[in-house]
Amino acid sequence: MYLLNPDLPVVKPGYKGNLWKNKQFDGGDYGSSQASFGQLIQWQLGRNPQQEEKKADKFRLKVHRNTSFITSDEDVIVWLGHASFFIRINGVSFLTDPCFKDLPMLKRMAALPCSIYDLIGIDYLLLSHGHRDHYDERSIKQILDQNPKMELLLPLRLSELLGKRRKQTNYPEAAWWQQ
């Protein structure tokens, strides 16, 4: 079965939607693989060829604490750590994949350039997918509470993670190749 949002246009001719198999999305032609339990254990216990290099790399970008980008009228892109960005284009502001707190077994590598409480007046929240390093419930809840008029831009079925908030938030969900 293929799923897409019937209310949104599809920009790729002939695209049927995202492949939905066994109650989950499947990459289909884009490469999907289901690892066996044994392969998972082997991957987790196996040697990582980049492990030493990663441990030795102490480079971190210097974080400049500043809130002027939030209230400025200028077009701007500000990195907030990992996959989180504040973007303003022609006066419209976007926040991507907010993950502003340490997660279990996953620590932030850089501080925020501002307080999470400074992130107000945001027009759109863009969530790329539901992995924990892109979808942090605590950060999303706080951003939604601080920006009650903010709209969400979501991939298909991600609204299910929003729980009760689904009813109080405006969001279109899109398949690949939908605008």
Language-model regions: role of each:
Residues M1-P104, C114-D118, L154-Q179:
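Metallo-beta-lactamase
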Residues D75, S93-T96, Y124, K167-T169, ...:
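Functionally constrained cores in energy, signaling, and assembly domains
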Residues N90, P148-K149, K167-Q168:
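Short glycine/proline-enriched coil/turn segments at helix->beta-strand junctions
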